[in-house]
């Protein structure tokens, strides 16, 4: 009988394993949605007759103690069966109400009922060692507490699952609601207060460039007119490279403006996030080499730098993939360096930092902190026009940051796009008349004005810069560079230089921001910075070779004229300056080599005083 009792006990633990043959023999009732120990749990509805048959088995297996131990477990089992019989005798309507109205109670009872057969078996095994009934009762109490804890864990898991299944629309609404709440509440900067160290800031004032540091590839905008000195181009026609169309494209990102401003002698700090990969490390190194402060730069080890990869498929087609989300768009609000914003006098940002939802909320938070600290907000629109469908869509997207800006810089094409103006310019003409670059009246720009705006700059490369204030408006004409190389066709080389020149002048004299004379000087300085930027780009990337050099190259050597992988041939600045034009061997504007130059000694022409003293 001992062996029989063992085989009988062996069939009960298999209720946790989903065995279909045992479900019919023991009459299990399955509750949907309940799990225990990673498997589906069952509650057993057995009759008194089957439970009474299991009672003698206990008495035989207890060796003398069966009279005592066999009765008490049978009583407890009878109590459980009485409860189950009552549930079975209830009408169907009451049971349905019980299931609908008391789901939580049913879940707990189902779990407890699934545990009760386990308790009887554990008591049978424990009875072979000791016949103490009180220990069994304490075990029951402890297990009941554990079931309550596990119920709470299940509820927590369900809550986390429900939170994870929130749709994108609800998330966007939540972001908007938090943004509206943050607008109403002022930012508390008391936790960032400390000792006043403003006397250690030095000169010139610090400028914080907020955004991404990356090599931006932007689509071309539209053909653009250029203001040229055609006489100078005719004298130096070897330096003139005339492509079919000149294109105005948006400038670079915040990292490019920071580097351009540092090259002008300004003090600038870059605030953003970089990836922990080779691209991010190279960009961080380049910022440090260019003397840009990187104390507010965060390194993200989980996300990589944004880049696009292209590969050839099996059918010979090109497939491109873009890394998203990237490290540049993952800067959180808690990672904003308030100490840098305290020291800075101007906060610069562009539309690049508004394209991602999380990055947009971080940008708005940084703008509000800067406004609260008294900084000047400089907004560089940098809007790739082919990426936008209408001006209404663009206005609704940039409306919030537009109203927070003190100084805004946009291009002439962006102004016409936002105001819905159709350009009346004549392209590809040699007419340098003032009507070639129209200066729109203040009434046209009035629809873009708001109460916080102090200055609005409208740039057209280095050809012309327009400025608008509440009291004054005007324009300053410039000139495009003479040596246009094959690498400056999009005319965006001077974009960062122009913005850096404007920032440099406005940070030095912020009190003269509404002075018409100072604004004209600022625009002229920005034009010069843009021209120098184009010259430096030409110096770095090379000049187009001359016709005679190409002929000599075909006959003798091909090492003098370098060519890039795209087949564009260029020469260095030294070769361009020292070589003579093929049609003007002794021209007056040719720069001779150093060893052939002649220097004349200057003689004193006259004196300021009669005695001959200077």
Curated annotation (Swiss-Prot):
Q: Where is this region: Disordered?
A: 47-75, 542-592
The phenotype of cells or organisms lacking this gene is: Plants display chlorosis prior to leaf expansion, but exhibit slow greening, remain autotrophic, can grow to maturity, and set viable seed. Albino phenotype of seedlings grown on sucrose-free medium associated with reduced plastid-encoded RNA polymerase (PEP)-dependent gene expression and altered chloroplast development. Delayed greening of seedlings grown on sucrose-containing medium.
Where in the cell?
A: Plastid, Chloroplast
Q: Which InterPro entries match?
A: PfkB_Carbo_kinase (IPR050306), PfkB_dom (IPR011611), Ribokinase-like (IPR029056)
Where does this protein chiefly localize? Answer: plastid
Taxonomically, the superkingdom here is Eukaryota
Compositional bias of type Acidic residues: which residue ranges? 548-563
Where is it found, in Gene Ontology cellular component terms? chloroplast nucleoid; plastid-encoded plastid RNA polymerase complex
Q: What is the effect of changing residue 208 to A?
A: Strongly reduces the interaction with CITRX
- Biased composition range(s): Basic and acidic residues: 571-583
UniProt-listed GO biological process terms: chloroplast organization; etioplast organization; plastid transcription; regulation of DNA-templated transcription
Q: Where is the signal peptide?
A: none
Task: Supply any other comment.
Answer: RNAi plants display abnormal plastids lacking internal membrane structures.
**Family according to the record:** Belongs to the carbohydrate kinase PfkB family.
Summarize subunit and interaction data from the UniProt record for this chain.
Answer: Interacts with CITRX/TRXz. Binds to FLN1 and PTAC5. Associates with the plastid-encoded RNA polymerase (PEP) complex.
The name of this protein is Fructokinase-like 2, chloroplastic
Origin organism of this chain? Arabidopsis thaliana (Mouse-ear cress)
